């Protein structure tokens, strides 16, 4: 199943909230993303059907291995671009918003090359 940027955002949010809270419910995702609970329910159903997450009997959300892999990939890109943009002098709020857009459209090859170039600059 091909994910849209919004699906990737939900997975990334669940990952971040799991790191912060431990256990995550749909209401936590809705609050964090500032979206309605019905929007989260629809996204959760789509992601569950796609094999990216599960929901237990207590309504806690759990990323599957595939879901975690996607979430970690997006989160890594988000952090990288946010840091790079801030280092280049971009306002943190703008850097965060721009990173959120870039993380979804950049190819794996381009991201890998940028990471390598940034690492070489730090050496």
Give each language-model segment a name.
Residues 59-77:
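Basic, amphipathic "hinge/linker" alpha-helix immediately C-terminal to the N-terminal HTH DNA-binding motif
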């Amino acid at each position: 199943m091909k994910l849209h940027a919004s699906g990737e955002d939900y997975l990334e949010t669940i990952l971040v909230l799991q790191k912060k809270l431990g256990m995550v419910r749909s209401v936590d995702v809705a609050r964090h993303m500032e979206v309605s609970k019905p929007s989260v329910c629809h996204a959760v159903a789509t992601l569950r059907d796609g094999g990216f997450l599960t929901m237990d009997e207590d309504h806690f959300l759990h990323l599957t291995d595939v879901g975690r892999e996607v979430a970690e990939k997006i989160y890594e890109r988000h952090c990288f671009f946010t840091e790079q943009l801030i280092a280049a002098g971009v306002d943190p709020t703008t850097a965060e918003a721009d990173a959120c857009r870039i993380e979804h459209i950049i190819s794996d090859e381009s991201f890998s090359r940028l990471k390598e170039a940034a690492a070489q600059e730090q050496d």
